[in-house]
Structures are given as structure tokens and as C-alpha cells.
Amino acid sequence: TAAAERLVTSDKVNAIMGADCSGVTGAILQNVARPNGIVMISPSATSPALSTAEDDGLFFRTSPSDARQGVVMTNIIMDRGFKTVALTYTNNDYGKGLADSFAAAFEAAGGTVTINAAHDEDKADYSAEVGALASAGGDLLVVAGYESGGGKQIIQASLDTGAFDTFVLPDGMVGQAIVDAIGPDLNGSFGQYPGSENKGADVFGGLASAAGFEGSSAFAGESYDAAALIMLAMQAGGSSASADVMQHVMNVANAPGVQIMPGQLGQALVLLEAGYDIDYVGATAVELIGPGESAGNYREIEIQNAKVETVGYR
């Protein structure tokens, strides 16, 4: 929160694109954004608790709540014929929220969660955690963690000991970096992260490629859209003050209006200045609902030939 406080009090920013993880986002919302009346749009904070957090109308997110991800993950696992899983989650707001959502959805669908256990980040050794997961058993191990942290180490230890050979990877675990680190032993594992099949995603992918980065990586499109919504809401209200911006985020994000794709932000600014309504589609088919969060589409992935491959959309 210190960095966010500095941005607001010293740098005098009018809005924050962020934060990234749910715990940090919640802390900044309550300790910095609300006391100072600053709008936040997070691209990647997915905890269900943020849907009902006291926010004074200041908080939005372009990623869907993990309440939906738990259902999507259940459907993906069930559709592949698996009925029994072990579950480990990173011991924070993100991990606990996703684990609770998934366990409830999976068991309601007739599945069995043999163990639902937290793990801490940045430990030198995860043999005790892997031992407990192995003892509980299951067709698969669901790892609700981070690809650069304890989640990766638990997968590696599970492979080394033969505890599990197939893993379910939620959004925080999806990335080419973990595949490169673990190698072909991760082939056949699968999962999901926010993403949609739409014209905007294709356009954004082309723009990203031209700029030298991978546009389909987790939360890339959501980040672009979060920043775009802040700018467009400022233009719609004719003001950069957060008190005005918060009133226009939902309007520019949703129909009715002229649809705006990635790469058309300049056109959108002109339209808004001329008094037209816009419907920002963006990279992720933005549609904000209820408490100002994405309705939620997911990209289903599988690790094939040591690559993260898209195999469908949910």
C-alpha cells in the first residue's frame, strides 16, 4: 500500500490501473483508494470477496470473479471424465477464494475433493505438503497458486515423487514460464484463464505481436482494457477527477453506443468529445455487470508439446 499511497499523495494520480493480486488490491482499496476517493480498475484481482467489498463505487475490474472460475474449472474437469481431485491453494485471499468456489462447485456437481489444503509461498521445501496431498490421493491435483512461486514447486515435487502426473492450472498458474521450467512432464495438464474468442481479441493479438509481446498471455488483454476504460471514462465526463470518472466507467464499457475495438481509442475520444455514446468492446469483449466487474469468459488451455495451447472457450 505504500507505493499506492505515494502515487496518490505525492504524484497526485487521479486513478489507479491495478492492483494485480486480490490481497494487495483489497488493501489498497480500503487503505488508499477509499480514504482519498481514487478510482481503481484491476485487470487481475479475482477474489469473490471483492464483489461485495465496501468500495464507495470506486472499484472496478476487467477480470471475472473466481466465483465463476470455480464453475468453469469444474465443467472442464468433469467434461474430461475426472471425478476425484486433490486441491492445494496459496494461502491468501486469491487462493482461498478460488479454492472455496471450486470445491463448492465441484462437489455440487458430484465430484470429490479428497483434500483442500493451503500452502505458503516461498518455502524452500514442500515435501510435507506434497506428502499430505499424495496420501489423500485423487485423479488430478488442482494447484490454485502462482506459476513463479509455491505452485510451481509443488508441481515439481509431485512429479519428482510420483505423487501426481496431471495438474489443473487456474489463471495464476498459466504461463509459458512454468512450462519452460518444468518441461515436457507438464504435457497433458490443463486449465483456464480469462479470455474470449472475439474480433477484439484477434485485433489486440496483432497489435501486441507488432509491439513485441504475446497478447494472449494471462491478463494482457484485461490490462489493456483497464487502462483504456480509465481514459475513456475521463473523456466521457470531461474531467480526470475520480469523482467524475467513477460515474462514467459503466457507461463507456457497455452498450448502447458505437463499438470500440483495440487500436480505436483515438476514434473513441473523438466520438465522446462530439457527444456520442460508445460501447467499449476492447480486447476481452468488455461487459461490466453488477458491482463493476467482467461478466466473464475463459480460455481453456492444455499443455501440448511443452507449449500452452488454447483448446476452447467457456
Short names for language-model regions:
Residues 1-314:
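Extracytosolic ligand-binding ectodomains
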